[in-house]
Amino acid sequence: MLSSRAFLITILILGTSFSISAQQRPLITEDVDIIPPGTIRIEAGIDFLQGAKYTVSGLTGDLTRVGVIGFNVGLSPNVEFQIEGVAQNFLSINSRGPSAVPLSLDPGANSANDTGDFTLATKIKLRAETARGPSLGFRFGVQLPNSNQSRGIGLNQTNAFGSILVGKKFGRDGRLNTFGNLGLAILTAPTALFTQNDVITYGVAGIFRVNKQFSIAGEVNGRANTRPGDGPLGTESQAEARLGMQIRASGLRFDFAGIKGLTNFTHNSGVTIGVTYDTPTVFAPAK
């Protein structure tokens, strides 16, 4: 059974792969909880986003993220390492405005594609939840410049971030899991030398476990520009709300969520679907 499930996950990753973790798909907001030491969490999904906007390239259109993937490794009872990103972005171009960077697109092109940027992060659980107090954690990492800015989708910049994680469970058997993030991201301004924008990152989320097989999940997640006006191109305020579900079956967790953009620089709406597999213990962490 284990080998067949692992094979299924491999097919999903190769066919649909690379939030976005002990992050709970379909949410972006990070949970405080850590996966067990020596285990690996594998996530794969697809996003369909309408009305995506790219202020640096001047493109707008409908974006398909094929392969929204995450690999999380439990290193100790309170430390987790994460790799996440997007294997390929496909943009159906609806309009083209002035571009702040040279684009390698034909004048009449109606589509573009590019690899997404990958993120490396470490999550540390600092305090376990008590009857009266929440659990606390810290997550920090770096976004790598894997995309090609000339394709008009990614920005090909190196960005750093860190956030405080808070979580509290309520109800019988802790069936309502609430958690939130508040942090800072240092975003390189892609069109200005020696310039950055320090944006505030935030997220508030909840997962309600209806029964052993079914949960309802929702969140609001985004970043807030701290500069006058809209901030440097490519670093504007963005936010979205997600509402969806998780379904557990055959050792996997399937998910689906609707997405609604909340700022002028965010996609209008969309959906995400995906699957998560938690392996048994596959290695013994160093002590």
Where are each of the predicted segments found?
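N-terminal signal peptide c-region/cleavage motif recognized by signal peptidases
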Residues: 17-19
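Bacterial N-terminal signal peptides that target proteins for export
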Residues: 1-8
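Transmembrane beta-barrel domains of Gram-negative outer membranes and organellar outer membranes
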Residues: 22-287
